A protein has these predicted regions:
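N-terminal signal-anchor module of multipass membrane proteins
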Residues: 2, 6, 14-77, 84
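Hydrophobic alpha-helical transmembrane segments
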Residues: 44-47, 67, 71, 222-236
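Alpha-helical transmembrane segments in multi-pass membrane proteins
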Residues: 45-53, 68-80, 97-102, 106, ...
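Structural signature of hydrophobic alpha-helical transmembrane segments
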Residues: 63-74, 112-120, 217-225, 269-275
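C-terminal ends of transmembrane helices
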Residues: 78-90, 126-137, 231-240
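Membrane-interface helix-loop-helix junctions at boundaries between adjacent transmembrane segments
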Residues: 97-98, 103-174
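Long hydrophobic alpha-helical segments that form multi-pass transmembrane helix bundles
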Residues: 141-229
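Alpha-helical transmembrane segments
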Residues: 238-275
């Protein structure tokens, strides 16, 4: 938008000279100071940082995790394309932003979640979490988390079933719950596991540091590979696409608060490394 011209008149004493100063002010959305890197370049590098996490998720949870990730990505891409066509806009599926949404959304889901639920959540993430607010740069919440929150509210039982990582048959069989028919009660495998957070909350059991670091615990598809998540963040920081002070400040603050509470009751509250 362009503001109306601002007109000022300055009279110069003694000579009667009057000058008209007209200034055009433009209002645009952030960022106002850029690094010179395009949106495509930044988004593509974020995808690169996520790929090792996705690969580890497939390695740890097998075919089920791969199907969840592919379905999440495909549903988000398809929804973005359809919405662009319906609104008469050029398809934005090539700017990598919706690919990030699809990958992040898939990485937050249980590896045994039925694929039809994954697809429904992907549609909701893009249609409501992103497009409803005006698209890239205008959404109030992370679209991937909007999709996950929707599934958590709509299907709480399915969103709290966790597969055991590194199962012997993870590459030779597909979890029965993944292929469940829409709105049918999914049948989960007998072998399930509690997340470290659930074990700490209900049993006061803290997972060992090596297990947390190398992803030897149950959890969402992409949350267990902490080492690779950390390396992905370091890659983005090295490329000047991430302010390293923000995640480091969050981790240090969480560790400090955890340490304070651990001093009060070391049984009820986890150690800083767990947090």
């Amino acid at each position: 938008a362009v503001l109306p011209f601002v007109e000022t008149h300055a009279a110069q004493t003694g000579c009667g000279f009057v000058s008209n100063l007209k200034t055009s002010l433009e209002i645009g959305s952030s960022p106002h100071i850029t690094s010179g890197a395009s949106v495509d370049v930044i988004m593509r590098n974020v995808v690169y940082a996520l790929l090792p996490v996705c690969a580890f998720a497939v390695y740890a949870f097998g075919i089920g995790a791969a199907l969840v990730l592919v379905t999440a990505l495909a549903s988000c891409l398809a929804t973005e394309h359809v919405i662009c066509r319906m609104t008469g806009k050029k398809s934005t599926t090539g700017d990598w932003s919706v690919a990030i949404t699809g990958l992040l959304y898939g990485l937050t889901l249980p590896p045994g979640l039925p694929l039809w639920m994954v697809a429904v959540g992907g549609v909701f993430a893009v249609a409501v979490g992103k497009a409803l607010f005006g698209g890239l740069g205008y959404h109030a919440f992370n679209p991937a988390l909007v999709g996950r929150a929707f599934l958590q509210a709509a299907f709480p039982q399915s969103m709290t079933h966790w597969s055991l990582p590194f199962a012997d048959d993870r590459f030779t069989s597909i979890p029965s719950s993944v292929m469940a028919f829409p709105f049918a009660e999914p049948v989960y495998d007998a072998v399930t596991a509690a997340t470290p957070l659930a074990q700490m909350k209900f049993q006061s059991i803290q997972a060992e540091n090596p297990a947390l670091l190398w992803g030897l615990t149950a959890g969402s598809t992409g949350e267990t590979g902490f080492a690779l998540i950390f390396l992905g963040g370091a890659y983005l920081a090295a490329r000047n696409m991430l302010n390293w002070r923000i995640p480091i400040s969050i981790m240090l603050t969480a560790s400090l608060i955890s340490w304070v509470f651990m001093q009060i009751d070391p049984v009820a509250y986890p150690r800083p490394a767990f947090t």
